[in-house]
Each structure stands twice: as C-alpha cells, then as structure tokens.
From Swiss-Prot:
The keyword Protein biosynthesis applies. This is Elongation factor G. Its main location: cytoplasm. Belongs to the TRAFAC class translation factor GTPase superfamily. Classic translation factor GTPase family. EF-G/EF-2 subfamily. Keywords: Cytoplasm, Elongation factor, GTP-binding, Nucleotide-binding, Protein biosynthesis. SMART domains: EFG_C, EFG_IV. Residues 8-283 form the tr-type G domain. Signal peptide: none annotated.
Amino acid sequence: MARKTPLNRIRNIGIAAHIDAGKTTTSERILFYTGVSHKIGEVHDGAATMDWMEQEKERGITITSAATTCFWKDHQINLIDTPGHVDFTIEVERSMRVLDGAVSVFCSVGGVQPQSETVWRQANKYGVPRIVFVNKMDRIGANFYNVENQIKLRLKANPVPINIPIGAEDTFIGVIDLVQMKAIVWNNETMGAKYDVEEIPSDLLEKAKEYREKLVEAVAEQDEALMEKYLGGEELSIEEIKKGIKAGCLNMSLVPMLCGSSFKNKGVQTLLDAVIDYLPAPTEVVDIKGIDPKTEEEVFVKSSDDGEFAGLAFKIMTDPFVGQLTFVRVYRGKLESGSYVYNSTKDKKERVGRLLKMHSNKREDIKEVYAGEICAFVGLKDTLTGDTLCDEKNAVVLERMEFPEPVIHIAVEPKTKADQEKMGVALGKLAEEDPSFRVMTQEETGQTLIGGMGELHLEIIVDRLKREFKVEAEIGQPQVAFRETIRSSVSKEHKYAKQSGGRGQYGHVFIKLEPKEPGSGYEFVNEISGGVIPKEYIPAVDKGIQEAMQNGVLAGYPVVDFKVTLYDGSYHDVDSSEMAFKIAGSMAFKEASRAANPVLLEPMMKVEVEVPEEYMGDVIGDLNRRRGQINSMDDRLGLKIVNAFVPLVEMFGYSTDLRSATQGRGTYSMEFDHYGEVPSNIAKEIVEKRKG
C-alpha cells in the first residue's frame, strides 16, 4: 500500500490554549468542516468528539490529548487536542514535542491568560511555529485589537494579523482577508459551511489598508528581494505575501493572527487555509536530534520515507476494547503492522500487533505507517512515554522528554479486600499513561500514596479508578512533597568495621558535603587517588549516599541539591566488601548532613489571582496570611491581577475561600515554580508533627 498523502502535504498540529478559550469547540468545527463528524459535538452538552473521557464530558475540560486525522484541500492534518488546565501541562509538553506547528487559541474577551503564557513558553522551548486564532468574536466585550496588544506585551511576540474582524459581539459577521483584500461573510443558514467573498465594506476600508500595510511591511522584512521591491514602491503579489508570511512563521519572527467564532461557525475555514499555507510540513522543520546508542555520538534524523524506521512514543492510553495504545510520531521510514520494532531506550524488541489511525475515539486499522504520521501502536508491552522505537541495525535514541516531580501527595485506601488487589493494577496502568503521576508506598505506615501536579490532577485519577477500573477508594488529606537540603559545607569520616572472628566487614571513607544551586540536583565526585579505596567499591559509596538521601535527617524527606566528594579512606584485603562501603557511605552522609545546617524546603507555587478592584485588599491580605510574597499587580480588562509566590501547603481549599471572599467573581490559577526554604518556626512544627 503506497503512501496516500505526500510528506510535504502533511501537517502535524496541536491546538493549544487557556481553559475556556474555546479550544475543543475549535477542534470540533475543524472535524465538522473537514467532513469527519456529521453532528457537531458541543462542549456545552458534553458530546464533543475530542473530549472522549467521561470526566472530560462532565467537567467540560480536555484532559488527554486525542490525536485525530482529517483532510482539507488535498492535505492531511493530524490534529492533537491539548488540555488547557495547569495541572495537565505535562500533556501539553508531551504533545509539543511531537508537533510541527500549533494553533494558539485565545478568547477575544479574556485575552492572554496565565495558562496561555505557560503553553506559549513550552512552544518556544520546543521551537514550534504557531498561528494565533482569536476566538469568541461574538461574545460581549470581544476585542481583537486588545488581544493583539496583549500578545505583544505579555508574550513578547510579534503578532501580524492576516485577517481582521467585520463587526464584533452580536454584529460579528465575517472577516477581511488582508492577503486577498476581500471580505468573507459567513452564511448562518448552512451553519457556516458556505460563505460569500465580497468587497470590503467602505467603513472598514481605511482600517483594512492600515493593517494590510503592516502585513506587507512584516513580510518584506523576511527577504531582501521582497524588501527591495517594497521600498521601491512596487506591489507584492499574493504568492509573495504568502511566501513571506510562511517564512516568518517558520523562523518564528512573526505570528500570523486570525479571528473568528468557532461556536457560531465563523472563521474556521480561513483558519484551516492558514494551517496549510503557513504551518510547516514535516520536511520543513529542523532535523530531530538523537544519539547513537553504540557510540553515544549526536546524530540527526531527517524526516523522510527513505531510511530506516524511527519514531517517538509520546503517549500511552488504555483503551477498553483494544488494550494499551501507544501513540507514536514517525520521523523516518515506514513500518508495517505485524512487524518487530526495537526500543532503543530500553534495549528491547517488541512486536507491533496492529496499527490504528485514530479519529478521536473511533479507530481505523491501517497496514503501514509512514514518516510524518501520528499513529497508535497496539501490542507493545515495555514501551513508555518518551521511548524511541526504531530499526535495530540503525539504532538511534531521540532526545528524552523531561517530566516534573509531583508536588502533592494523597493517601489512597481501598475500601475492601477485593479493591486492594484491583487498585495496585489500576494505579500501575495509570502511572504508565501519565509520567507526572507517581505511586509509592509510605514505609512507616504501609499506606499507598499517589503524587501529582495539583489537586485536580489527583481528583481525576481517583475518579478514573472508580469509573474505568471499578475500584472504590477512600482518600486522605493532601500532603505536600517537602524536601531537605543543606546550607553549609562539612567534611566527615566514617569507619564501618565489624571484625570479631570469621569474615568481617570493613569500609572506611572520608567525604566532603557541599550545598549546590537550587534545582541542580545531586552530584558525586570521586577524588580517590593511589588506590586507597579500590575502584570496584566506589560505586557502592555513591549508592549508599543515594539510598540515605531518600530519608533526610530533619524529618525523613528526600535531600536535594548537594555535592559529595569522596576524597580519602582505607580498606581491608579480606573484610572489605561492597556492602561495607555502602554502609560507610550512608553513615558518613547522615553524620555530615546533621552538621551541615540542614533546612526544610517546600514547593512554592506561582499564583495569579484575577479580582474586581473592590476585593483587591481582602485578597492581598489573605495571600499575606498564607505566607505569600506579592510580586506584581496589574490591570487587565477592568480587573486587578495579583501575582504572588505562595507555599503550596497554604493553598489547600483556596478556591472555596476565594469564591466566598469575592462572591464568586475572583478566579485564580497556580503552577509549581520552585522550592523555597520553610521559615524555622513553621519547619519546627512540621518536623515535630512528622516525628510525632
């Protein structure tokens, strides 16, 4: 079976936005106009095709990025719907990794919200070109030009409108296409499927000319030949303008900007045209960096059908009918269903039972998959998110994705003995799907703890236990993931010796313990010379320290951000062993930690609160009571915006308190920012309670 769509006519795009900007509705309309869904799914009635998990239907937010394939004007668009809630940034980060381009949806009233900034930063990090769609132009307070300004100020980007609205709020009827200099007016009777191309209304002609001039100027800057033409007063052709917009979009010096109202079926076709015209094909993005596992040298994977198969697993889902689905972005070559692939990250071979093209949650079996495609593999046992799948003879490891550590834990207790067994299996499956979700057992109590990125994240996990796995569980109070670190440098020696007849134990080490920059992690340096400790025992010292650092000396929390230098020691020909050096390393570390001024760290959250002015004083007072540090105060659309760092431990139940303090008019968002030192009086309480 030959490839149906040439590689240069494929677009892998994500739709990313703040919660409630209308992202799922936009995806739905794309599927409707490209002929995939016959009845448009509305988020309001919980029937959206993309939002297919039960919880998403209830909450009306998108949780897992469903990958869907659709066609528009001889192009294949692989659409990845990404969640807009802060607790799910891991999903967004994952999909950014495998996209070639993105559509950023903004609400014409709300503009640039905190989550939009996070998603924008992630797209910058992965170098993803994007176009902006200003949605909800029919809403009261809609203002396209306000959003344009906010993108400049808050996102430090260069938005270049390629169409501008005709009317706003209930008079919004269409857009002016600045490339063609025509008005496009949608027909309400056909649910926006038909539209008329007309002359620009006379009252908007001046504005259209002004914005067309800005567009042409931005385009001319992309190319010397175009610049000369522009400065010489010559008209640029439509083709030249399109070429210039695409060049600027791909090098990220400009962001094409469009508007519409997905809910009212206006502006979606022009958005699809822009996706095809301006976002990159897999052949137009930079080659993917990888490492040759044999030589550890850097290699580059070029997107093409030639060459051996290489792809990246970027998402795992459990499907009630098919079992485990592994979503893979194919970068090079092709693969047939039923064949074997090599997982170069795990050094294991796996058989691909079936290949599925996904349409939201309907599926189509395909025989083979080609470069540039996104496809679900069935039958992989050992592959996890971030693993590379490739041809064994031409192995490559594509760059890994980084996943954040959980900042919040909750104890879960199964209600019955039968639930106990099912719960272990279910949590294991959920942890495979979501690398930012962790499961652990608390040693002292034997309780199962689940960890994640926020309260909503864990609520949804518990909810899925109930619905998908039929496990009833009680949940405890949320617990914060504290850490410990040291503030001063100390040198210590420890001799571990048991020599009373028979085979003894002997390990003797000198270590230096030093604090490191926040967030820099653990470092072990071996400075042993002259063989005072044999080479084979040195990893044991490191291992002993790594085990001991899981339980800090203050309150048993993991110790972070420090460096250990092993610089001296001694050994015994007969009695020394790896075990003895492991114990010596562990004891030396514990003694050194006690003397190195240990302190407790807590997760600090970046909190942004939006409130009407009259509640501002109360909100700031409340944040101060929660040990918050206020960073800035801004105005946005008649509301006051307060930015602060607040300890996570003080933020439990904040949504309820904020609602009652502002009569339901305040909203907030928070995301983990960094670990900060706990004030000594509070640290003392935490330590006593923990040791209680």
